Swiss-Prot record:
Gene3D superfamilies: 3.30.540.30
Taxonomic lineage of the native organism: Eukaryota, Metazoa, Chordata, Craniata, Vertebrata
Family per similarity comment: Belongs to the peptidase M49 family.
Highest taxon listed in the record's lineage: Eukaryota
Sites bearing N-acetylalanine, chain numbering: A2
Record-level GO cellular component terms: cytoplasm; cytosol; extracellular exosome
Statement: the UniProt record of this protein carries the keyword RNA-binding: no
Cofactor binding annotation: Binds 1 zinc ion per subunit.
Keyword Transmembrane: no
Species per Swiss-Prot/TrEMBL record: Homo sapiens
Residues involved in Zn(2+) binding: H450, H455, E508
UniProt-annotated location(s): Cytoplasm, Cytosol
Known catalytic reactions: Release of an N-terminal dipeptide from a peptide comprising four or more residues, with broad specificity. Also acts on dipeptidyl 2-naphthylamides
Gene name, Swiss-Prot/TrEMBL: DPP3
Protein name: Dipeptidyl peptidase 3
Tissue specificity field: Detected in placenta (at protein level). Detected in erythrocytes (at protein level).
């Protein structure tokens, strides 16, 4: 069978997202608003298949056809009759659930491919003898012929998402390299175009000269439009000797369905902010305009404390190998008032707490823009994965001048808290009970600080298009050098475009460090209801959780390519390195032998040294992170961050050897089953499913009752239209990296 790195185990944890009580408390109008927003999110989430791998849309279409014709129990009878064992059929269900959960065949957390853990010929027998194949023999056989090989292939380039020889990505055509990505970013910057809703396709003429297409996501294609904001950009350009063409219409039929549902949601908006927000999102997805999405986000920021909260669009850039294109996501959630009250108290203290951060006031925003901070129970989260907390929007210009919102996703955190003692790796026995007791509360504190005062803090020094600066060049001093500011962001440059491949992880590291640093502040712990010995335990478990996570992070490092595949985990490893470097026995990692006779390890944190050794080390590191970010010093930022993120086998830690131990004892990330909403007359019903791979599959089989077959056709048509860009996805066209 396949290497365990590339399969999902049969005993993978599966949890259901509990939002029954939150949904019950909604009024009929709020339910209708949530229903249509959920439909929009689920439709848009299908675009992620096209953003992940060339074969993902076909795999999704094949699975959807199979399970629409026979539910998991019915298909099981057929599979056993075809000679599969119970374990092999369960492996197939887990694979299918994984594809639905990640919206593709690469893990959303780690960007590693996963393949079915059963023989290919056995799966082929099940598929070609299924009810779906009886009903539509040509279509099912065609889908299998298109994706069967790629579904199982683990040749080196296909094991991970990446650019050029490093991996596979559908944000770029298969012949693009990192140099192409940099050139395209410079082109986009020169035209003041955002990369968030784009993909890049490169073609090479007979003389080897490249030609680039930048394609915007939109309902409209080449049709004339009244909107000059985007249409004036839709043309041919010459940039540094290379032809560029800006086009639009990517994912058009999918976005058409998103727009139709957003139009319906408008009728149930609670206020004018929501109505205007939806109108701008509709404009954005119709025209391909990120500027319209920014305007919608402005109204969204102004919509303080809504009962039903949502956000939708091309948002997070973690999975673009270059770090600037957004993956589609949409969520709909309901406010949890009790937990939100704690976060509101944290917001009320935020201005005071910002002063505790280890950089001068001139490196903080000129005015603190009081954000919304709510705890939400998720009803729908469409995309490749569900985070525990979010700080959005990601647009730097809005964050600096208009503000942002923070959300903590309470029912997602509840799934994350559930820890079984026997699965707690790398901890001392006497730490395990304390860890289980305080992991949940400490995580609430860390998520709150990470989102509000981590992502929400710090200023970017900018020179605008008129040459004006947002800082005083004469008086502002760099605390690291003692000199005046030497570098800054010029008009059109953003954090993501400037720091590109390290931007996401560097920013997560800054936010995580702020959480660790500020959780030492007594006022913070009082806000969350902890004092005395309990407060000390919360601090200890928060720091212990971080250093353990730094060790677990090694699973997400690829030694062959010298790269990290997950931004948050790279950030946690960097923090572990900083705390190890602090010395004095603050953190130690000891290789051991487990009770099973196999390699193991133990992480120890000396709680008596957190304040005396850990805090000063974190203070120095955090100040450097912020100064380099504020000043847009890419060279300095890369040197610092990549230095700490380097993984070697040098003693005393021998991280590459430890990585083997981590892989040996890794636990797969849980799959989460989400409910559906269904409209019956004018009533919206909540449909829940069991916490199992079969339950997760059923939830997807019932997600698109009206137009499932149509969506499968749309996905395969869109994938086929661009298939030539990855033909032989395992290798780039000759002459191209």
């Amino acid at each position: 069978m396949a290497d365990t790195q590339y399969i999902l185990p049969n005993d993978i944890g599966v949890s259901s997202l509990d939002c029954r009580e939150a949904f019950r408390l909604l009024s009929p109008t709020e339910r209708l608003y949530a229903y249509h927003l959920s439909r929009a999110a689920w439709y848009g989430g299908l675009a992620v298949l096209l953003q992940t791998s060339p074969e993902a849309p076909y795999i999704y279409a094949l699975l959807s056809r199979l399970f629409r014709a026979q539910d998991p129990d019915q298909l099981r009878q057929h599979a056993l009759a075809e000679g599969l064992t119970e374990e092999e059929y369960q492996a197939f269900l887990v694979y299918a659930a994984g594809v639905y959960s990640n919206m593709g065949n690469y893990k959303s957390f780690g960007d590693t491919k996963f393949v079915p853990n059963l023989p290919k010929e056995k799966l082929e027998r099940v598929i070609l003898g299924s009810e779906a194949a009886q009903q539509h023999p040509e279509e099912v056989r065609g889908l299998w012929q298109t994706c069967g090989e790629l579904m199982f292939s683990l040749e080196p380039r296909l094991r991970h998402l990446g650019l050029g020889k490093e991996g596979i990505t559908t944000y770029f055509s298969g012949n693009c390299t990192m140099e192409d990505a940099k050139l395209a970013q410079d082109f986009l910057d020169s035209q003041n175009l955002s990369a968030y809703n784009t993909r890049l396709f490169k073609e090479v003429d007979g003389e080897g000269k490249p030609y680039y297409e930048v394609r915007l996501a939109s309902v409209l294609g080449s049709e004339p439009s009244l909107d000059s904001e985007v249409t004036s950009k839709l043309k041919s350009y010459e940039f540094r000797g290379s032809p560029f063409q800006v086009t639009r219409g990517d994912y058009a039929p999918i976005l058409q369905k998103v727009v139709e549902q957003l139009e319906k949601a408008k009728a149930y908006a609670a206020n004018s902010h929501q109505g205007q927000m939806l109108a701008q999102y509709i404009e954005s997805f119709t025209q391909g305009s990120i500027e319209a999405h920014k305007r919608g986000s402005r109204f969204w920021i102004q919509d303080k404390g809504p009962i039903v909260e949502s956000y939708i669009g091309f948002i997070e850039s973690y999975r673009d190998p270059f770090g600037s294109r957004g993956e589609f996501e949409g969520f709909v959630a309901v406010v949890n008032k009790a937990m939100s009250a704690k976060f509101e108290r944290l917001v009320a203290s935020a201005e005071q707490l910002l002063k505790e951060l280890p950089w001068p006031p001139t490196f903080e925003k000129d005015k603190f823009l009081t954000p919304d901070f709510t705890s939400l129970d998720v009803l729908t989260f469409a995309g490749s994965g569900i985070p525990a907390g979010i700080n959005i929007p990601n647009y730097d210009d809005l964050r600096q001048t208009e503000g942002f919102k923070n959300v903590s996703l309470g029912n997602v955190l509840a799934v994350a808290y559930a820890t079984q003692r026997e699965k707690l790796t790398f901890l001392e026995e006497d730490d395990k009970d304390l860890y289980i007791l305080w992991k949940g509360p400490s995580f609430d504190v860390q998520v709150g600080l990470h989102e509000l005062l981590g992502h929400g803090s710090g200023k970017l020094f900018v020179q605008d298009e008129k040459g004006a600066f947002n800082f005083d060049q004469e008086t502002v001093i760099n605390p690291e050098t003692g000199e005046q500011i030497q570098s800054w962001y010029r008009s059109g440059e953003t954090w993501d475009s400037k720091f590109s491949t390290i931007a996401s992880s560097y920013e997560e590291c800054r936010a995580e460090s702020v959480g660790l640093y500020l959780c030492l502040h007594p006022q913070v712990l009082e806000i969350f209801g902890f004092e005395g010995a309990d407060a000390e335990d919360v601090i200890y478990v928060n720091w212990l959780n971080m250093v353990r996570a730094g060790l677990l992070a090694l699973e997400f490092y690829t030694p062959e390519a010298f790269n990290w595949r997950q931004a948050h985990m790279q950030a946690r490893f960097v923090i572990l390195r900083v705390l190890l470097e602090a010395g004095e026995g603050l953190v130690t990692i000891t290789p051991t032998t487990g009770s099973d006779g196999r390699p193991d390890a133990r992480v120890r944190l000396d709680r008596s040294k957190i304040r005396s050794v850990g805090k000063p080390a974190l203070e120095r590191f955090l100040r450097r992170l912020q100064v380099l970010k504020s000043t847009g010093d890419v060279a300095g930022g890369r040197a610092l961050y990549e230095g700490y993120a380097t993984v070697t086998d040098a003693p005393p830690e021998c991280f590459l050897t430890l990585r083997d131990t981590v892989l040996l004892r890794k636990e797969s990330r849980k799959l989460i089953v989400q409910p559906n909403t269904r409209l019956e007359g004018s009533d919206v019903q909540l449909l829940e499913y069991e916490a199992s791979a079969a339950g997760l599959i059923r939830s997807f089989s019932e997600r698109f009752p009206e137009d499932g077959p149509e969506l499968e056709e749309i996905l395969t048509q869109l994938a086929t239209a661009d298939a030539r860009f990855w033909k032989g996805p395992s290798e780039a066209p000759s002459g191209q990296a």
